[in-house]
Structure formats: structure tokens, C-alpha cells
Amino acid sequence: MKHPIVKHFLSNPQHYRLFKNVMESPNEKDARSLDELFKQFYKEIRIVKYMNSMIRIFSIDFDKRVRKNQKRYPLTVDHPEAGDRLSSETGSDAFEEFLDRQDDLSQHVQDYQLYQAIQKLTDKQKSVLTKVYLHGATMQEIADSLGESRQNISNIHKKGLENIRKQLAAQKKGEK
């Protein structure tokens, strides 16, 4: 019984009991009953498989239609007119440009306690955290730009986060 459909059929206790009865003491009635149950089970499996493939094919066709319509009828917001300047020449939006111009992580923090904790970090910790969280740089990219090892940058990053956690915990204890 290596066939997965047969295994699945026999996983039902009722089917297995009937199969066992037919194998131990074969009789025409039980054999026909087992055969009918298996035919019904197999028919259901085929219907489920058909429905599954139809759903998959329909979803692929739907995606194709949506992409075709988007290509055929693009939104006017996606393509600014010649006089409009919604995005820069590099293609980034205005918000990303604003973030790129801001090189201090503390300028992006709205929580005053977090702001104070960031202010107490070393310049190198601030720099690493800014590059990771504002610019999305990897540890390796930061290490290359600062001329240090990836492991050292990772340690600076961890220590910076640890210092922020300690500062916030100390501030919370002071409030209680």
C-alpha cells in the first residue's frame, strides 16, 4: 500500500475496518461495498483536484487581466505630467528624499524618552543605528563604508540597542 490515494482512503477507520474484513474473510457483499466506497472516494478526490486546478488557473488568468488593464489604463498619479515634480530624477518619492536628507536618527523619533536615550549613545552607535534603520544598509555595507569588520559593526549595533533598552528601563523605574 504505497499509493498515496489508497493510504488516504484507508486512513478512515471505517474504510480500514471494511478492507480488513474483506482481506481476512472475503465475501461478495463486503467486497462490493468496499469497491463502491473507494469509487466514491476517488470521484471526490478527482473533483477536488479539478476544482483546485480551476482555482489556480483562474487566479493566474485574473492576475494577467489585472496587469493588462494596469498597463493599458495607467493611473495618472503613477506618471506625473511634464510640469509636475512628484518624484526626483532617481525615482524615489518625496518622503524617501526627506529621510535621506536627515542623517540623525533622533530627528525621526517622536517619543521623548527614546529621543533622550538615543542622545546618550556614542557617535559611532548613532551612526550605525541611523544607517541600519533609516537607510536600510546591511552590516557589511556599513563595515565597508567605515572601514571596519562586519563583526565590529554588529557589536556596535547590539551595544547601541542594549544601551537604549537600559536607558528606557532606567527612565521607567524613575517614573514609578
From Swiss-Prot:
Family annotation (InterPro entries): RNA_pol_sigma-70_dom, RNA_pol_sigma70_r4, RNA_pol_sigma_r3/r4-like
GO MF annotations, alphabetized: DNA binding; sigma factor activity
Disulfide bonds: none
CDD domains named in the record: Sigma70_r4
DNA-binding region: 139-158
Coiled coil location: none
Expression induction or repression: In the mid-exponential phase of growth under acidic conditions. Positively autoregulated, in the presence of RsoA. Down-regulated by YvrL under nonstress conditions.
GO terms under biological process: DNA-templated transcription initiation; regulation of DNA-templated transcription
Pfam family, one: Sigma70_r4
Keywords in alphabetical order: DNA-binding, Sigma factor, Transcription, Transcription regulation
Residues spanned by motif Polymerase core binding: 30-43
Family: Belongs to the sigma-70 factor family.
Quaternary data: Interacts with RNA polymerase.
Task performed by this protein: Sigma factors are initiation factors that promote the attachment of RNA polymerase to specific initiation sites and are then released. Together with its coactivator RsoA, positively regulates the expression of at least three operons, including oxdC-yvrL, sigO-rsoA and yvrJ. Required for the acid stress-dependent induction of the oxalate decarboxylase oxdC.
Name of the protein: RNA polymerase sigma factor SigO
Protein species of origin: Bacillus subtilis (strain 168)
